[in-house]
């Protein structure tokens, strides 16, 4: 009887821990997404957010020639800053007392960022943030963000379970802190990212785009997207190791043979 009660208690604690994961809106994710949209990055220009997309265009269109936007376009051309690299920067930013600052390990900013003067980038980003009155825009849409997050938590979060990641990839329990952020400018773009703050568990992010079908007016609630994006934080480091290249090629070829008829 005692063992049964302990088992039930453990199950309840596990469910409670999983229930603590809630979707979020992030000012830095919106900042990088809207900067990318203003710079004409096609992956952030889907405009699948209905009135929010219209509000974004009305507010930021006048800043398409802003010095930071011009500089950012150059970074894309020279360093390939796009897609998940935008998101990787976003999760390594925080806003404190009205200023954007870098946090975490700068060595985690790869994929082109390692060739960028990060202090200079943040300085330019702060100018865009101030000149566009970005915080004012973000706060004006706080109710919109929160209303959607409630819907997302109802429709998606009951299906999100993260305890298996550590067991599957490391053979141990998951110590990571999993977070789901909605990118309201991302549309059909979805990315995974991670960061390690000093003295904190590894934070694993799934940044999922707000996707409103323009034909039906229905919101997309895809329960598989966060799970897919979380995987990147575990799979990508394995792929980057040279000693794994041959093994992955062999497995990839076998998997392709099994699935090529459906592709």
Protein language model annotation of sequence segments:
Residues 220-244:
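Active-site recognition of the HExxH zinc-binding catalytic motif
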Residues 237-261:
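Post-HEXXH active-site segment of zinc metalloproteases
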Residues 69-164:
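Long, mid-chain structured domain cores
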Residues 20-100, 263:
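N-terminal mature-domain "stem" immediately C-terminal to a signal peptide or N-terminal signal-anchor/transmembrane
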Residues 142-201:
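Auxiliary, metal-adjacent structural segments of Zn-dependent hydrolase domains
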Residues 1-22:
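Bacterial Sec-dependent N-terminal signal peptides
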Residues 130, 166, 170, 231-236:
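Sec-exported extracytoplasmic/periplasmic mature domains
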Residues 101-112, 190-220:
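Active-site scaffold of zinc-dependent metalloenzymes
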